[in-house]
Amino acid sequence: MTEYLLLLIGTVLVNNFVLVKFLGLCPFMGVSKKLESAIGMGLATTFVLTLASVCSYLIETYILAPLGIEYLRTMSFILVIAVVVQFTEMVVHKTSPTLYRVLGIFLPLITTNCAVLGVALLNVTENHNFIESIIYGFGAAVGFSLVLILFSAMRERIAAADVPLPFKGASIAMITAGLMSLAFMGFTGLVKL
């Protein structure tokens, strides 16, 4: 039980996929302008990442490895992610049309979010079992959502601040992301996996 908790904390804080592994930067920069869309994107990504981790583990364990076709891993994981994203898009469209409109193009772009594919591939590479795969996927998603929500809240405050002209827009966003990454480096050594 303790190692599962350490895996979760390590994935959320110490080995954050956005700030440490630099995966998922496109939605991190693209959806973080408004807090509402960041929260929605975080929830959708959490659902997709967790479900994609489970599905990719099952496909790897029960189809690819027994048949000796591990070379199809990346292609099959991309297909699984696309199916999970389509399912998520249908669920969001039915349950919350407003959120569906707010997320716009970013919801289908979860398919190309490298963090989702990265989590699926790292689950296999690190030989996680079924429970560890779920925790790893959920932890990566929570870490992504945490960073996305914090960053969007900071960007909203920065938008209201008097920023010098050369730093407006993407420049101040990159500086802010760098400072967040430095802050998360403070968690290094908290959990050794």
UniProtKB/Swiss-Prot annotation:
Pfam families: Rnf-Nqr. GO terms for biological process: electron transport chain. The chain crosses the membrane at residues 5-25, 39-59, 63-83, 102-122, 134-154, 171-191. The keyword Transmembrane applies. It comes from the Bacteria. Keywords: Cell inner membrane, Cell membrane, Electron transport, Membrane, Translocase, Transmembrane, Transmembrane helix, Transport. It is a multi-pass membrane protein. GO terms for cellular component: plasma membrane. Its main location: membrane. It is found in: Cell inner membrane. The keyword Oxidoreductase does not apply. It is an enzyme of class 7 (translocase). Signal peptide: none annotated. Its EC number is 7.-.-.-. The complex is composed of six subunits: RnfA, RnfB, RnfC, RnfD, RnfE and RnfG. Part of a membrane-bound complex that couples electron transfer with translocation of ions across the membrane. PANTHER family: INTEGRAL MEMBRANE PROTEIN OF SOXR-REDUCING COMPLEX, ION-TRANSLOCATING OXIDOREDUCTASE COMPLEX SUBUNIT A. Belongs to the NqrDE/RnfAE family. NCBIfam families: PRK05151.1, rnfA. This is Ion-translocating oxidoreductase complex subunit A. It comes from Aliivibrio salmonicida (strain LFI1238) (Vibrio salmonicida (strain LFI1238)). The lineage of its organism: Bacteria, Pseudomonadati, Pseudomonadota, Gammaproteobacteria, Vibrionales.
